[in-house]
Amino acid sequence: MVVSAGPWSSEKAEMNILEINEKLRPQLAENKQQFRNLKERCFLTQLAGFLANRQKKYKYEECKDLIKFMLRNERQFKEEKLAEQLKQAEELRQYKVLVHSQERELTQLREKLREGRDASRSLNEHLQALLTPDEPDKSQGQDLQEQLAEGCRLAQQLVQKLSPENDEDEDEDVQVEEDEKVLESSAPREVQKAEESKVPEDSLEECAITCSNSHGPCDSIQPHKNIKITFEEDKVNSTVVVDRKSSHDECQDALNILPVPGPTSSATNVSMVVSAGPLSSEKAEMNILEINEKLRPQLAEKKQQFRSLKEKCFVTQLAGFLAKQQNKYKYEECKDLIKSMLRNELQFKEEKLAEQLKQAEELRQYKVLVHSQERELTQLREKLREGRDASRSLNEHLQALLTPDEPDKSQGQDLQEQLAEGCRLAQHLVQKLSPENDEDEDEDVQVEEDEKVLESSSPREMQKAEESKVPEDSLEECAITCSNSHGPCDSNQPHKNIKITFEEDKVNSSLVVDRESSHDECQDALNILPVPGPTSSATNVSMVVSAGPLSSEKAEMNILEINEKLRPQLAEKKQQFRSLKEKCFVTQVACFLAKQQNKYKYEECKDLLKSMLRNELQFKEEKLAEQLKQAEELRQYKVLVHSQERELTQLREKLREGRDASRSLNEHLQALLTPDEPDKSQGQDLQEQLAEGCRLAQHLVQKLSPENDNDDDEDVQVEVAEKVQKSSSPREMQKAEEKEVPEDSLEECAITCSNSHGPYDSNQPHRKTKITFEEDKVDSTLIGSSSHVEWEDAVHIIPENESDDEEEEEKGPVSPRNLQESEEEEVPQESWDEGYSTLSIPPERLASYQSYSSTFHSLEEQQVCMAVDIGRHRWDQVKKEDQEATGPRLSRELLAEKEPEVLQDSLDRCYSTPSVYLGLTDSCQPYRSAFYVLEQQRVGLAVDMDEIEKYQEVEEDQDPSCPRLSRELLAEKEPEVLQDSLDRCYSTPSGYLELPDLGQPYRSAVYSLEEQYLGLALDVDRIKKDQEEEEDQGPPCPRLSRELLEVVEPEVLQDSLDRCYSTPSSCLEQPDSCQPYRSSFYALEEKHVGFSLDVGEIEKKGKGKKRRGRRSKKKRRRGRKEGEEDQNPPCPRLSRELLAEKEPEVLQDSLDRWYSTPSVYLGLTDPCQPYRSAFYVLEQQRVGLAVDMDEIEKYQEVEEDQDPSCPRLSRELLAEKEPEVLQDSLDRCYSTPSGYLELPDLGQPYRSAVYSLEEQYLGLALDVDRIKKDQEEEEDQGPPCPRLSRELLEVVEPEVLQDSLDRCYSTPSSCLEQPDSCQPYRSSFYALEEKHVGFSLDVGEIEKKGKGKKRRGRRSKKKRRRGRKEGEEDQNPPCPRLNSVLMEVEEPEVLQDSLDRCYSTPSMYFELPDSFQHYRSVFYSFEEQHITFALDMDNSFFTLTVTSLHLVFQMGVIFPQ
């Protein structure tokens, strides 16, 4: 056996254990040099001490610490360096042993392959001899029997070659028994019967071809199992590897501990004993503990060196003392010492670089070895593939023999041709298993054999072939000659279409050697270890690595490139040496100057020493980095060696399985030789035997196939099995069952092989099964443990749809139908109809009541969809007279973040009741979100109330109705159009009554929508016949519809904002020391806010008119007085949308007829701090305010008897953009003042009495529509409620802001009776600090004012005054319709096409009690949320009074004071 792929085999394995010891000797020399270096440094320390002594400036104590520190670091560095070198040397030694073992295994496998190929060639020649035509009279009888016996012997020989050595004894016994059976079966009569039954020679050919293929190029990928392949002629002498220089006794111990294969070998000169790895089987006894035992003496040696260094340090101290005492130091002597030290340092550096070059050479050699092994593996894989193809072809040929043909053609010439074809397939198999350099000879042999086959095609020649006697000796000689003519290396063709890789064996392809060497040294390395060339011969195999990371294009970096990379490092080391030499000369100069001029100072020397230490540290760091690179390369080679070892194990398993298949085929051939009955030796028996041969051939093909091709092989096997079953008739199957032969082993083989993908004899594991064997496990010390990333499962808790079925106290019944509907809803509804919502009225709070969060629901950091739906209450108002607010239905959904195309098509008829907080006690702690606290959420709330019929009759004696609340959290999307028209919107005030002194500030009494995108739409619709009942009842309940719209880019903003009214916000009776608050109605700080209030056409309702006609004024007044005592202010309808933030192209073309009232501050007491923006505080904002009043017909008649009228106000915060047109037409806009009355003492500031929309993009649209005949009631009520349209326009820079601002009036903002020490507050109506705010109030076209005018004419001025005074005492300000839109953060081109006829009423604050803590978001606290709120108020008209005494009278029991 000749190993041609490794550097340690044959002539290329000169480097034995002695050479390894020679390599380790420089390390010993290095250690000695280190000792000398330390000794010389000690003398240098003595020199420094003597110089300091001469100049009388040396302080030994200071230098002592520095010297000790330097010595300690040097010692630690040396110890670490030696330990690292020991580890690297140990790893290199282990890998050497491993490479030797793998190379030995490869050699053995090559030898097995060669022997199997020779056996298959012999069998092929024997079959050809059977085809040779001989004399006809000798074609039968004993000769055929002997030839068959010879074929069996050749098959046995093939099995023997594929068997391990430890099984030879058993095989010999089996062979003796089989030979005896063959000889007993040699009777002429039985041989003649066998000839008459047409013994299938194709089956013999199948046996030969299959067996010759079964031992092909390392057959299996299965792991090696209990098979140890060793040959007597391959036994190798073992020597030892000694890693460190030690005494003779230590070397002897190492020889006893760790035997290593030597370089010499008999017969084939192979140097590998280990079959499955150096750390496996009985030869892997040296584990980690033994390695530690070997390293312990080295540790002891290092400790001894440390003790010696410590002693030398003390000697240095003694020398310094002596030099100080005796003054015997001479500089000339020191000069020689320094030169000697430099010379030794240079020598040390050179030796160190040489050692590094040697290590790099070793790494290069290992790289070459890995390349060679990888090439060998590639060739074996190619052989395996070719053998598999040849066996598959033979299988198909045998199946063709089984195909039923015409009976007259199944004999004679056809059989002869089929046998010839089988011989050709067998020759092809032998050719595939032969090396390339023998292909020419094989081709000549094939040509001759083909000619012989063609010549032997006649029946006469066939008879002659049967009569011929082929000499067995010549066959044996041929087999021996062929076995010797072929080398172990088969082919240098790359692997074709089959890439066997494992994920755990993937290796990084960038293996770079970082050591440096000169060109000459690298050339010497090339001469020492030549790389195998590209040509293949009997002993030299070309290596083209095609299946590994270092093969083909990835292996371009050869030795010259490595040398080029190492040269810069060599130059760098030389430069470092020069720098050290220069520093040493600097030290000499400093010493000379100190001696001659008496100017030596320790401080200067101290800096020099520190600099030297710093450079030394840098050098150590660079050296450690270089060692880390070497360790990384070793790790990569570890992985590569392991992968190759695994593949070798799998190839061994394939070899074992092929041997088993060949043994089965041998048994089948013996069964053919068994004498049977003469009548059963033909026909069905031959057919069954051929089928059995086909199955064995299929099994052999399966064994030679890789695991990843099992699926294809299964399909082929199923088809073959079907053909075989179809080719046998039932009669033949019955005969097969009656036959006594084949033997049990053959039956077992047939059953096993008939399974398409089952394991054979439990030796082939399942295709998807991970198989490990203890014999093949590799030592874990050579494998770097891989870190596995642990992935934790993210648990997403999604709240389910919940429905609150509990009814609170003092709440009325709920419709069961609507409750069922709200519970069953899973998606956002397009229309939320008939929604009722009741207010949250907290009872009296005790003192020091702690704060709570989210009384009803606290949905923090959630995307919540809340839908509260109360169904159509048509006749339930009659029953509401003596009961509190009804309990709403609550349906809560957490909707997914999606992009719906349509959000809410229609939010109609939505009612909402106010949130009233009564009689809160002192020191009440703040709480947040009395109804809902939805912090950091995107929340959509829609409150929809619809079709309350006959509502006006029972509104006198009942509490505020419970509106339906439908709330949705809408997905973030980009709708194209937002709201084309927001019509008929009313808004009512939020009244805060009798809050005690010291009330802490709170935020967002109704809504605190901080840092949110808010859209509030208050829509009041279809107010029919409400003018007559407004005298006798409190403010009606508006409809509430609220939507959270997408963050989108609507194209339309507001084409026309028409007819908008706005009323003031009044704060009454605030006591002294009232702290400042912000945004009494809306606090929209740092937000983009859009508010639009639109009041529109109020149509006539005949039924309501008739009812008013039926009732007299006296009855209405009496009903109003009775109703005001028993009810709370009703909830208006509110429709609110959040609009997107966009850049509108057209904003407002013309701002016409703009009226604005002044802001008046009345009666502010002393020490009252300033406040900002009583009506609007728009600090640091670009604000456009348009107040438009138009077509006030006969308005002067009623101005005498009423409070100052509320003009129409249109206000806009223009976006930061350059729009082409701002507002097309803002017509007839009124605005009323904001009054603050009698705030109690020490009232703490609060923020956003109605809405606190801080840091939000807000759009509020209040739309009041179709108010007809409202002029008649203006005489008996307070200042009328103007129409208010407010928008927050985009952050844009308009080119044209206001084309025409005509007829603009401004009314005052009245702050009444503010007590002393009242702290400043901000934005009584709106506090829009640091925001871009657009507010537009548009009042338009009040139709049919003539009838109202006539009614005023019928009443005298005195009656109107008396009615107004009585009305002011008996009623609360009514709730107008409010339609509010929260605009999205986007760039809309046009926002609202038409906002018509919008009214808004003020927000009143009454009698806050003492020590009242601030709270946030009385009704809703939606912090950091995208919220849309829509309130729609229906059937109401609002009148404002600023009288707190009447409110105390009206709330009787609740406000006793």
Curated annotation (Swiss-Prot):
Q: Please give an example of a GO cellular component term from this record.
A: cytoplasm
Q: So which tissues is this one expressed in?
A: Widely expressed with highest levels in brain, ovary, mammary gland, skin and adipose tissue. Also expressed in testis. Detected in a number of tumors including osteosarcoma, mammary carcinoma and hepatocellular carcinoma.
Coiled-coil positions:
75-119, 339-390, 610-661
Q: Where is the Olduvai domain?
A: 165-259, 436-530, 707-799, 800-871, 872-963, 966-1021, 1022-1114, 1115-1207, 1210-1265, 1266-1358, 1359-1457
Claim: Transmembrane helix is one of the keywords in the record? no
Residue ranges with Basic and acidic residues bias: 190-200, 461-472
Q: Where is the composition biased (Acidic residues)?
A: 165-181, 436-452, 801-810, 821-833
Q: Which InterPro entries match?
A: NBPF, Olduvai_dom
Q: Which domain of life is it from?
A: Eukaryota
- The ranges of region (Disordered) come to 162-200, 432-472, 721-746, 791-838, 1100-1139, 1344-1378
Where does this polypeptide localize? Cytoplasm
Principal localization? cytoplasm
What keywords sit in the KW lines? Coiled coil, Cytoplasm, Repeat
Q: Where is the composition biased (Basic residues)?
A: 1102-1120, 1346-1364
- Additional observations: Encoded by one of the numerous copies of NBPF genes clustered in the p36, p12 and q21 region of the chromosome 1.
Q: Which family does it belong to?
A: Belongs to the NBPF family.
Protein name from the UniProt record? NBPF family member NBPF12
